[in-house]
Each structure stands twice: as C-alpha cells, then as structure tokens.
Amino acid sequence: MIPEKPKGLQATPDQWKAIATRGNNLLVSASAGSGKTKVLVERILMHIQEGIDINELLVVTFTELAAKEMKERLRSKLEEAIEKSTDEVLQQRFSKQLQLIPSAMISTIHSFCMKVIRRYFYLAGIDPVFTMMDEIEGQLLQEKVWRALEEELLEQPEYEEVFATFSNDRSDDGITNTVYHLYQYSRSKREPKTWLSNLTQNYAVGTDYASTPFVKTYVKPALIEELTYLIAQYNQLLKEIELLGAPKHQAVLEDDLDFVKAVLVHIQEESYVFAYQTFEDRKFKNWSTAKVDETVKESLDEIKAIREGLKKDFQKIKEDYFVISPEVQLQQLTKVNRILSKLSDIAVMFYDRFQDEKHQLNKLDFSDLEHDTLRILTKLDQNGLKIASEYYQNHFKEVMVDEYQDVNRVQEAILELVSKPVNRFMVGDVKQSIYGFRLADPSLFREKYEAYAEGKSGERIVLAENFRSRDEVLSFTNKVFQQIMNKELGQVEYDDVAALKTGNLSYSQDDDKSSEIILIEDVDLDESTDDLEDAEGFEKVENEIHYVAQRIQEMIHTPFEVMNDNADAKRPVNYGDFAILSSTKSNNDKIESIFAAYGIPVNVQKAQSYFKRTEITTMVSLLKVIDNPLQDIPLVAVLRSGLVGLDEIALAHIRTTSKNTSYYEAVCQFISDFKLKDVDYYDSKQQLALKERLEGFLTLLNKWRDSANNESIAQLIWEIYMDTHYLEYVHGQSNGTQRAVNLHALYEHAHQYESSSFKGVRNFIRFIEALQKKEKDLDEAPIATD
C-alpha cells in the first residue's frame, strides 16, 4: 500500500507509484518525455524524508553530466524544501543532506567502480597508484601489442591458414580487426578468456551435419521460422483467391504451399539431405494463364505479384542454406572449426599480452574497472565471505539505476553484488537503447520487463505519457513504430502498453500541426536547373539540406509560433528551437557550409572531421615532409598552403627545372641552378621572390628536421607555429577562432600521444593514418560559447 500523494506534488498516478512504492525491486519503463528524472529526484527526496541519508543510496547514471545535473536538481530541491519547511528538525535534516551531496554516490558505473577499487584494491592485487588509460592511448598500446604478436605468429606455419582466411593481397586488416573485435566483445562477458577459449563450441563437428551444434542452434531455428512465415503468407493468399473463384490459379498456389511444407517437414525431422534434394528436384509451376472474369483480374494480378515476392524469399532460403549439399557443408564446418580454433588461440594470446602490458604500465581502462570491481566483489575471505559485496549491500538502502537499457552483463553482475534481494530501482526505456555498439545488453531490461509484469522477483511500472510533444507528433511516431518494432527489432512489442500517450494537453488543438513527410525529387541536371538555383554539382543530400535551410528561414520570418518554456503563452520561433538529425556525421560539413550561406547559425556537435580541416591537413602534410621530404603530394600541399603560399604557376615553374625527379629534388635544383628565365607567365621579379621564399622554407625545413630528432612532437609543432606565425595566419581567416583552437588541439593531442610512452614523428603520423583508415577521428576542439 503506497501513501497518499502530497497535495503540492504534481505527478500522475503512475509517476507517484514509481516514487512511493517500497519493499520490492522496481523496473520503471519510462518513455521519452515521461518525467523519469523528476521521478528519480522525488524518490530520492522521499527516501531522505523517511530517514535515509543521501550517501546511503547508490544512484548510477549513464554519463558524468547526468550525475552532475542530478546533484544540482537535488541541491535545488533541498534548498527549496528548507525555505518552505517550518519544522526545525526537518530543516536540519535537509541541511545535512545538502552537505552530503558532494560525497553522495551519484555517478556513472565507472566512477563507482573506481571508488570500489580505491577502497579494496588489495583484494584484486591492484597497485593503488594506478592511472586511467584513455581511448587513444589504449588504441596505441593495442596496436603495439598486436604487431609484436603478429610478427611472431607469421613465422609459425600452423597459423598460415587463419591469416590467409582473414587477409587479402592488399591488407591484413581483416585478422587485425577480428582480433580487436573479439577482445572488445569478450570484455562484456563475466569470464572473457573463457568465452574466447570456447569460440569453437558451436562449430564442433562429428559425422552428421544435422547433429552439429551450429545447425541445431542457428540453422534449424532460422529455417523453421522463415518457412513458417512463408506458409502463413501462402495460407493468407489461398483464403483470398478462394473468394475470387479462380481454381487453376488456386492450384498453383496450393502446389507452392506443398513445396514449402515439404521442405519444412524435412527440416523438422532434421533430414537435411532430403531438404536439399527437394530444392534440387522441385520447381515452381508457372502462373496460370486461364481466362478469368474482368472483375477479379486486378485482384489476381496483385496476388501474382505477392507470389513472386514469396518465391524470391524461398529462393533466398535455398541460396542461404542449400546452395551446396549437407555433406559439403559438413566439410566446410570442419574447416571452420579448425580455423576458429587457431583464431581462438590467437585471441587468447592477445588478451593475455594486452592485459599484461597494461599491468606493467599500471594502467586501467574502463573495461578493467568493471572486471576488477567484479573480482573484488566476488573475492572470498578466509571465512568464505564476500567482504566487499557485503559491505555495500549493508551500506546501500537502495540501488537506483538510470538508463537501465544500456547496462551490460558485467555491469549487471556488479549491481547485483552490491544490492539486497529487494532494493533495486531501475529506470529506462528499451525503445531508446542505441548503445549496442558499446556492448549494452537491452535484453536485461526486456527480461525484467516481462518477468516483473507477472510479479516475478519485482514489479513493473510503465510511464507512457509524454509531456514534451504534441499529440500529432506522438500519433505519427506510434503509427510508424507499431509497424516496425517488435521483440526481434527493438527488444519489445510496440503494443498499447509501449505506445506513447499524450501527457501535455495544454497545446492548442485548433492549429494544424500534422507531422509531414517531404519527398524531394532528384533534379535532372542535364535537362533543367529551373527547380534549383545553381543546381550543377549538387548531390541528393545537398538538395535536402537546402530545403531544410529554406524551411527554417521561412518559419523564422513568417514567424511561426511555439509555446514558451512555461507552456502558458506563444512566442515566435528562434533558431535554437530547431534540431537536425542526420543519418551520418559525414554530412556535418555540408550542413555547416550550406546553413552559413543562408545565414543560419548552427552548432554541429562533435563533427568527426577534425583531420579534414584545412589547417590540420596542412600540418599533417608538413609533419610527413619533415619525416621524409621525398613525398611529392604532402610537399606540394605544404607549398600551396598558407605556410608557404605558392600558387599553381609557381609550382609548375619549379617543376620545369627537373621533370624526372622528386618534387623536393626539383625544389633544391631550382635554387642551386637558379637563373632567370624569359617566360611570359612569370617575370624576373616573381622568379626572384619565388627563390627567396623557397630558400626560407628549406632553411626552416632543415631546422625542423633537426628538431624532430631532439624534441618531442608537441615541441616541434609549437616551434612550427612560432616560426611561421601560422596561428596568427589562420586566425585571420573565416572561422579563424575555430581554426586556431584546432591547431592548439593538435599540439595537445601530440603531447597526449607522447605521454603514452610512444615517440617519433613517423609513429605519430602512422597513428593519425590508422585513425583515418578505420574511419575514426579526434573530436574537433570546442570553442567556449555563451
């Protein structure tokens, strides 16, 4: 029985239930805009009023920013409660909680793990003065460990087959990336090395294809599901065609259905040889050409079209599973097992060496924090007690987890070990789980969502009301996701319980604010450009960006009105009211440039284009030239850039001196053999100025090459900035502040690189090239804004 809701608290019945329910594990499925943060804060405040100190709660957030905002909200609420309360004892209690906020366990799971390790480091044999390894340092160390191991393995014949399988003539990135991915994925398991060692489990083979674990675990269930779906579709078509009175067409569908059913029976009986033979022997009959009444012809054509789609689906089953006989597949599985066995060995070796290397450096990464915490919490003392686990179970009166859909299995194990049987409070929305690439496991949420609905081990509360959006937005969203989201795609059935419901009824209902889908036709640039000004060279995505920019300007200048923050009056829309979602970050540069042309201010967060910025590509080219000046493309890029400032005519004039050497040698020869030439395109004054500029550049280049042998990369980069005044130069260009900040960031990245025990210009360049090759990037440096 939950208490009555206080009169001053604005909360829906379900929100109040989530705030006030006690004595059970709770899973709160909170849809977007449903007030989950408010529920979390109010529940914490209620715990405080019930006598629990704020530092007796563990509140796990997904980001440090969320933790900071949570603390600020609590601080504000407590200060407000102190002002309003006339009870001196209660005021003192709230004041005490304000003092406890800085030490409260409101943090990310990794920050909590850090605290556990700092307290119980001795239980896991960890040096207490360890330091954290950032992502870049981890990538560098990973590369170093792998290259050393790879070199050893390539000398051993037993690994030739596995290297050949994952590599090609151009690159061995295949096996490199596979080992990295296996390592990363294994770290989401409670026993990573055990998982890596068991890679071949599902590929064990005997004498019979049907009895292999791979077939039983993956092939058979998938085939049954796909064939059952086809049978259901054919049954539906037969119901429809029966009403049309077309017996010959119906007979064709019945024959199709018999064909599919025959294959399904063979699969259910694990007679894969017969299933294969059925595919080989039987063919689909041609669609009947019998005359039919004109009134049913259109319907029959629709059925025929659907049948063609089903035939393609059936043909794809053959291509996926029966393009070769089961006997040959068994032989292939034997080979796969052999290759996987060696791959497993390699992955375990890499795992051990990478962990050892981190241990030698006394470094931990985020994954290490989780696994070391798990070791500490499961460590038994001489009396068989989990002393760390019991300490936290006794200390925390409740364990609260925000964004529970983004927790992985290792994190879940940690949370279980610091919780009592019925003191967990989990909030999230499985529909918003987008961190699978970070190994989040939304099935954890789904398992509890289903179990708690039946009252097993806990209670489920659904917050479906959305207070952030208009009914038109929510109705459109529901219409889309009811068609596409289910347990297989999205981890939850998008039923009436999961559907979004309108919570904010204050929006005016007399305006037409229907959701829109805008279809932009491709412009035929060969025939006409009337529909799009300056259309030549446009890509499809650019057309879309232009349309969005025009629509924003139209709404700004109309002006379009929206509700104010208090939802009690309307105001004209401003640029900050618009958000743009793009399917890929590669569009960010285009959005920025096109919006700038329309005079629209835009803030693109973490545009992954740092290494594409002109000032950065110039500096990277210069570092390549310092490492090896006999590289034509980087050298010409530097000479053409603002660092030297040559134009195309000057570059061509230099090349006329020596056409068959490297460009660097041509530059040197141009200076050493200099004499004025009588050419129309370059007068004597320009030629002398060119010689002086090149001499100045070569003097600096030689100086920088000497510095590269004696200084750190960061010192070298700063020396270049000082010698060339490049920072001042870029500051004077468009978007100059951002350009200068990016150059400062390059200096910081170089300093960070070398602090990781990695040295040398060439290695730094290789690191940058590796990031670019893997389509990774460093974030563009942020500018302080108002």
Task: List where the protein language model places each region.
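Conserved NTP-binding/hydrolysis module of P-loop NTPases
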Residues: 71-79, 374, 378
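Conserved motor-region signature of P-loop NTPase helicases/translocases
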Residues: 1-72, 136, 144, 161, ...
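Core structural elements
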Residues: 101-114, 166-190, 343-348, 364-377, ...
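N-terminal accessory segments
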Residues: 1-34, 38-43, 52, 266-383, ...
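ATP-hydrolysis module of ASCE/P-loop NTPase motor domains
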Residues: 98-105, 123-191, 301-323, 334, ...
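Conserved helicase/translocase P-loop NTPase motor core
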Residues: 107-113, 343-397, 410-411, 546-566
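Conserved ATP-driven helicase/translocase motor core recognized via long
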Residues: 56, 177-364, 458, 546, ...
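Conserved ATP-dependent motor core of P-loop NTPases, especially the RecA-like helicase ATPase domain
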Residues: 23-25, 62-65, 78-274, 364, ...
